Regions:
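C-terminal edge-of-domain segments
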Residues: 114-139
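An N-terminal amphipathic alpha-helical segment
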Residues: 1-100
Length: 139
C-alpha cells in the first residue's frame, strides 16, 4: 500500500519535526543528560538528522537491531520518541537486520501503517537524494 501525502499533510508532518516539545526534549537530552540510554541516542540522532536534512517526516535511518533489541534498546528508543511527543516516524533503514527490527518496533506498540517516502532538502543531504523510500509507523 502506497501512501499519497497531500501538501497540507506533508507540511503538518514537517511542523511535527519542529514542534517545541520535540525540540525541547532533544536539546535538553543533548545538554543535560550525561549518560543517555542507547535508545535515547538512536532517537536523538534521528531527530538531529531529520532536522539537519529538513526532512518532511521524522526519519529513522537506523533502528536498534540484534542483541540491542534483547537488551531493551528498542523499548528505550520508543520511550524517547514518546517523551518527545513524536507519534509517527518513517523508517528508511536498509540494513540486513531490518525485519527483526521492524518486528521489535511493532512489539513495542508501534503500528506499521504502510510504505511512504520522505523528502529531504538536497542541500542538506550529502547523497543529494530528495525522496527516500521507507516504512511509516504510528505510535
Amino acid at each position: 500500500m502506497k501512501i499519497n501525502i497531500t501538501d497540507e499533510i506533508r507540511q503538518e508532518i514537517l511542523d511535527t519535526l519542529n514542534r517545541d516539545t520535540a525540540k525541547e526534549y532533544f536539546e535538553k537530552l543533548r545538554d543535560t543528560e550525561k549518560n543517555p540510554t542507547r535508545g535515547q541516542v538512536y532517537a536523538y540522532r534521528s531527530w538531529e538528522q531529520s532536522t539537519e536534512d529538513r526532512a518532511d517526516m521524522f526519519e529513522v535511518r537506523a533502528l536498534p537491531w540484534g542483541s540491542q533489541i534483547k537488551d531493551g534498546v528498542m523499548k528505550e528508543f520508543v520511550a524517547a520518541l514518546t517523551a518527545a511527543d513524536i507519534d509517527e516516524i518513517i523508517v528508511t533503514d536498509q540494513s540486513t537486520a531490518l525485519m527483526e527490527s521492524v518486528h521489535a518496533l511493532v512489539a513495542e506498540v508501534a503500528y506499521l501503517e504502510g510504505v511512504g517516502t520522505v523528502t529531504r532538502d538536497p542541500l542538506h543531504d550529502p547523497s543529494g537524494r530528495r525522496e527516500i523510500k521507507g516504512l511509516v509507523f504510528r505510535f
